[in-house]
Amino acid sequence: MQLILLSSLLLLGLSLANGHETDPEGQILNSLVETVSRLEKKIDKVENAFLTVHRARSFGSGSERLYVTNKQVGNFEAVRNTCVQAGGRIPSPQLLNENKAFASVLERHNKAAYLVVQNSAKFTNWAAGEPNNADGNKLCVKADAQGAWHSASCDEDLLVVCEFSFI
């Protein structure tokens, strides 16, 4: 919407610069400027409301990331696709407080979920004896209901949990 208004202002300016007085008293231009100003104020309000909600949601965990489930289950590929379509990704906790926030979702539903472990991760939460891919079939990682990490088959149907990072 703002782009359309700015384009209109540009076209009007070009028209006036070329000597075509389509708005001799500047009413259209003034109206467009007022509309853009109102839209900017509304955008500021939406941004502030969004940040307030985000801060409230992350207040308890101290995490800047939000972990959400749709209560469905799926294998790794299905979970990844679901998260990407929702604008998120499979969780990848980088800090203890992020893992706690992620684990709180799992604990609430008493289920495990996939996560992605970064090769350069400074934080890990492997359960005792993990990672363990002795049979060669555990190429994914899951977190149990308490947030401990385990090697897992990518074909397991686990709780869909997606990570969203807004800041």
From Swiss-Prot:
Tagged with keyword Ion transport: no
GO biological process, one term: ossification
Keywords for the protein's UniProt record, in alphabetical order: Disulfide bond, Lectin, Secreted, Signal
Domain C-type lectin residues, every copy: 62-163
Stated name of the protein: Phospholipase A2 inhibitor alpha-like protein
Family matches, as PROSITE patterns: C_TYPE_LECTIN_1, C_TYPE_LECTIN_2
Species annotation: Elaphe climacophora (Japanese rat snake)
Protein's cellular compartments: Secreted
Signal peptide (from-to): 1-19
Family: Belongs to the alpha-type phospholipase A2 inhibitor family.
Described purpose of this protein according to its UniProt entry: Has no PLA2 inhibitory activity.
One Pfam family recorded for the sequence: Lectin_C
Sample GO molecular function, one term: carbohydrate binding
Gene Ontology CC annotation, any one: extracellular space
